[in-house]
């Protein structure tokens, strides 16, 4: 039978689906049976267990409430316990009814519950009666106590009156005795004794009897009544009789009537005793009921326990039934799974493998041979599969198409080869054009570099000679001429630098370097204006600054480039201002720093304002200049993230505004000390082929105490180093007659590793040159260079110490020594060496592991320690390290230098003290 591949697969899948459906139905039936058994057991067992537990809890609560009911001493507690008993009784009855509906025999428990309920109702009624009796006892007792107190008060009043009367009679007796009326005095004395004093005693007895009755009533209690009721009644009866007898002897009719009325209330003591007697009887009855309740509850608990045992037995039977049903379901599912697995294997082998998989594998191998290039390979038998027959016919058609495509591909290959040859010719032409452009650019750069070198070298001779001549006292008369030579040379150097900056900007700005360091804006502006002040001498021009008070003390940026831009703006203002003023302003505007140069010069036509920032554009050719200053300044402002703009009014003046991002510096500004550098005893090797440059450099360095040996080429340098004493450093010119300076530096670095190499060149020192020579030279000194700058750069590159006292705040140390003595500073230095210096090792370890928090803590401790010992530069470096723990320079060298300086300062102090 020639079935299609789809039908064969459908047949196999249908058989597997039927097998899956059968397994599902059998499994569903077993699970449903187990679920039904579990449901029946759950519905029957769990509720009965819960009801048994609730029944036990309810009986316990009922017993607890019954005990509390007996001891209830107020109506609120009595009602609360009664409600609890009622609720628990109803709950027990409901649970018993539910258990009875489940088929349990609860007759004995119900009868026991009925007896307990009757006993509890009787107990509740007795407790209520007892509460009423005690309320009546309290009210009657309070009335009797109040009446007795009133009698005592009235008796006290009568006694006081009688005492007053007796006092008057006594006074009269004394008068009669003085009048010698003996008989009258004796008669008055008899009356005093027989009547007045006797009456006082009777009233006092009345008061005491009333207080005794009051005390007896107040001391009455249930326990006393139960023990000695007849005696208490007799004592109260005697006391009341005394009160009644003394009441008759009261002379005042009104008081006597009032006491008689009050005695009526006191006479109700017998009723009070009767109430206490009833209370005692009820309490005894309640005690008997409580004991009976305990016995009944014990019997009730026994019946409940038997019921719980019955429930547990039924639950065990239900669980056993559930386990049997579960086991039967597991066995049936296991058997069905094995049968299904066998049937599935048979279906996969017979339908899928023989009819589908194996023919497809053979067909795939044939197709792979076809793809590998064996186009004439035969196809296997299709085993009567319609789709595979179709694939065979398609492959025959594919063979024909492949032969046609091969012929077409050969034709296309010939066309592509021709086109490729044409493209290669175009690429060669393009490369030649680009090479010519690059060659022209390199020639331009080489020309500028050569011109820079050729101009800077004689400029160094001019400026250096002028500076040396200016130091000669014999030439004071020609000082103005020397100043003119120096100014002209510096102007020429400025023009040369402008041309080089413009060349770098025109090349895309790759060689225009902009630094980012902290600086102080106010001193920078003031010093720049001060440098320009010499150019206004003898001219009617006023230079002024207007720096806002809210200017930050320190900013981040490139102070050298900012000074260059401002100097250019001030130079233009001086060039175009004949008289009036030039004001340098500085202020902040939001997140920007504004520097303005305003003048009262000739002004600029508004139509030309847009052109003045273009290269080689001049407002007036009569004023001089190259026309590059504003172009360079504008591009430098852009490189620093700002802009340069201008406003002007002809014949009024102009205002140029430099806008830069306002970034307040968090690190301290390094302090610079402008003083002469001493290089005493320092041996330097000068490798320079220009004799004039040699002579000027030697003369400049001799004034600082250095020992200079000059050679003219690389061979002489190598010979001198080999035959002479060691040199501290070598100044290497880049252009030497035999080999270039960089190649010589590589040889010197290999042969003399301890020799410090310093570049000394008139070449353009751009970023590319610095990167090429950074591994060879400690630094590069450009020519021309002033004498002071030359000495400072040498000291910097050689890491010399200009003045040890610069590392210390001497005034602070002097004050501390005056207040506490140098011995204390010695102790501080020892503590600093023991505890602070080890922090430097911790900083190195933390810097290696990039642990910024640990660096901050150590830097903060070092900052405080350095500040306390007057090491102000080291303290600033530590503060900078605390702010920038992973990028700031390390203070190790400065701290070592400061410790040495402090030791020298202390040694000097000790010598002075001796």
Curated annotation (Swiss-Prot):
CDD domains in alphabetical order: HATPase_EvgS-ArcB-TorS-like (cd16922), HisKA (cd00082), HPT (cd00088), REC_hyHK_CKI1_RcsC-like (cd17546), TorS_sensor_domain (cd16172)
Ranges where the Response regulatory domain occurs: 683-798
One Gene Ontology cellular component annotation held by this UniProt entry: plasma membrane
TM segment ranges: 9-29, 333-353
Phosphohistidine modifications at: 453, 860
PROSITE patterns to which the protein is assigned, alphabetical: HAMP, HIS_KIN, HPT, RESPONSE_REGULATORY
Periplasmic face of the membrane: 30-332
Predominant location category: membrane
Cytoplasmic side: 1-8, 354-914
Post-translational modification: Activation requires a sequential transfer of a phosphate group from a His in the primary transmitter domain, to an Asp in the receiver domain and to a His in the secondary transmitter domain.
Catalytic activity, as annotated: ATP + protein L-histidine = ADP + protein N-phospho-L-histidine
Oligomeric and partner information: May form homomultimers. Seems to interact with TorT and TorC apocytochrome.
Name of the molecule in the record: Sensor protein TorS
Annotated organism of origin: Escherichia coli (strain K12)
């Amino acid at each position: 039978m020639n079935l299609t591949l789809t039908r064969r697969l459908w047949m196999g899948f249908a058989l597997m689906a039927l097998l899956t459906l059968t397994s599902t139905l059998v499994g569903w039936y077993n699970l449903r049976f187990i679920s039904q058994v579990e449901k029946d057991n759950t519905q029957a067992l769990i509720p009965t267990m819960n009801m048994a537990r609730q029944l036990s809890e309810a009986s316990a609560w009922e017993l607890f409430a019954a005990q509390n009911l007996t001891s209830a001493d107020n109506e609120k507690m009595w009602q609360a316990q009664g409600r609890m008993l009622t609720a628990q009784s109803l709950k027990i009855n409901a649970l018993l009814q539910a258990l009875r509906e489940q088929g349990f025999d609860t007759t004995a428990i119900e009868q026991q519950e009925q007896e307990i309920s009757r006993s509890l109702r009787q107990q509740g009624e007795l407790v209520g009666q007892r509460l009423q009796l005690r309320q009546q006892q309290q009210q009657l007792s309070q009335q009797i106590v109040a009446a007795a107190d009133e009698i005592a008060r009235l008796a006290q009043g009568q006694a006081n009156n009688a005492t007053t009367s007796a006092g008057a009679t006594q006074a009269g007796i004394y008068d009669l005795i003085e009048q010698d009326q003996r008989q009258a005095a004796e008669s008055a004395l008899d009356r005093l004794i027989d009547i007045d004093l006797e009456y006082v005693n009777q009233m006092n007895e009345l008061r005491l009897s009333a207080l005794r009755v009051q005390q007896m009533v107040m001391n009455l209690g249930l326990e006393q009544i139960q023990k000695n009721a007849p005696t208490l009644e007799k004592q109260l009866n005697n006391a009341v009789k005394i009160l009644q007898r003394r009441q008759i002897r009261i002379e005042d009719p009104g008081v006597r009537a009032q006491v008689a009325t009050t005695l009526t209330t006191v006479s109700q003591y017998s009723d009070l005793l009767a109430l206490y007697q009833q209370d005692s009887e009820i309490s005894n009855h309640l005690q008997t009921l409580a004991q009976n309740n305990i016995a009944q509850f014990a019997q009730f608990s026994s019946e409940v326990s038997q019921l719980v045992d019955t429930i547990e037995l039924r639950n065990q039977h239900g669980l056993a039934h559930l386990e049997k049903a579960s086991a039967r379901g597991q066995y049936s599912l296991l058997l069905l799974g094995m049968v299904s697995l066998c049937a599935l294997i048979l279906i996969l082998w017979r339908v899928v493998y023989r009819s589908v998989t194996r023919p497809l594998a053979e067909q795939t191998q044939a197709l792979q041979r076809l793809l590998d290039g064996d186009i004439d390979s035969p196809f296997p038998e299709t085993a009567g599969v319609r789709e595979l027959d179709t694939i065979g016919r398609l492959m025959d058609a594919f063979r024909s198409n492949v032969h046609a495509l091969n012929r077409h591909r050969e034709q296309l290959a010939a066309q592509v080869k021709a086109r490729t040859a044409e493209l290669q010719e175009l690429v060669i032409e393009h490369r030649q054009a680009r090479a010519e452009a690059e060659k022209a650019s390199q020639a331009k750069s080489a020309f500028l570099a050569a011109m820079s070198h050729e101009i800077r070298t004689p400029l160094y001779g001019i400026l250096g000679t002028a500076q040396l001549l200016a130091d000669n006292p014999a030439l004071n008369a020609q000082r103005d001429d020397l100043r003119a030579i120096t100014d002209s040379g510096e102007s020429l150097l400025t023009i040369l630098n402008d041309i080089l900056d413009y060349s770098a900007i025109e090349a895309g700005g790759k060689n225009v370097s902009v630094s980012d360091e902290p600086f102080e804006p106010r001193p920078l502006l003031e010093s720049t204006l001060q440098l320009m002040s010499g150019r206004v001498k003898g001219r009617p021009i006023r230079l002024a600054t207007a720096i806002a008070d809210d200017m930050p003390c320190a900013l981040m940026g490139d102070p050298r480039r900012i000074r260059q831009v401002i100097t250019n703006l001030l130079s233009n203002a001086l060039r175009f201002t004949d008289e009036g003023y030039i004001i340098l302003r500085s202020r902040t505007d939001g997140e920007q720093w504004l520097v303005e140069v305003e003048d009262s010069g000739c002004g600029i036509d508004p139509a030309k304002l847009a052109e003045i920032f273009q290269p080689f554009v001049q407002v007036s050719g009569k004023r001089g200049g190259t026309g590059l200053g504003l172009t360079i300044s504008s591009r430098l402002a852009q490189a620093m993230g700002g802009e340069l703009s201008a406003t002007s009014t002809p014949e009024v003046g102009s205002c140029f505004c430099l806008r830069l991002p306002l970034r307040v510096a968090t690190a301290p500004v390094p302090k610079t000390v402008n003083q002469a550098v001493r290089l005493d005893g320092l041996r330097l090797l000068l490798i320079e082929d220009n004799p004039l440059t040699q002579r000027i450099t030697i003369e400049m360095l001799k004034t600082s105490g250095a020992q200079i040996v000059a050679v003219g080429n690389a061979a002489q340098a190598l010979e001198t180093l080999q035959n002479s004493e060691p040199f501290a450093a070598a100044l290497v010119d880049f252009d030497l007659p035999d080999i270039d300076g960089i190649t010589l530096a590589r040889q010197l670095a290999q042969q003399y590793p301890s020799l410090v190499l310093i570049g000394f060149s008139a070449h353009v020192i751009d970023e590319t040159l610095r990167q090429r020579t950074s591994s060879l030279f400690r630094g590069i000194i450009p020519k021309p260079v002033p004498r002071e700058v030359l000495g400072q750069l040498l000291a910097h590159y050689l890491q010399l110490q200009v003045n040890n006292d610069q590392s210390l705040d001497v005034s602070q140390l002097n004050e501390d020594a005056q207040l506490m003595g140098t011995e204390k500073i010695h102790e501080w230095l020892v503590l600093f060496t023991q505890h602070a210096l080890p922090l430097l090792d911790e900083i190195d370890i933390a810097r290696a592991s990039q642990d910024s928090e640990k660096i901050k803590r150590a830097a903060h401790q070092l900052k405080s320690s350095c500040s306390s010992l007057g090491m102000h530069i080291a303290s600033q470096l530590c503060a900078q390290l605390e702010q920038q723990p992973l990028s700031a320079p390390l203070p190790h060298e400065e701290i070592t230098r400061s410790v040495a300086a402090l030791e020298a300062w202390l040694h000097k102090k000790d010598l002075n003290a001796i």
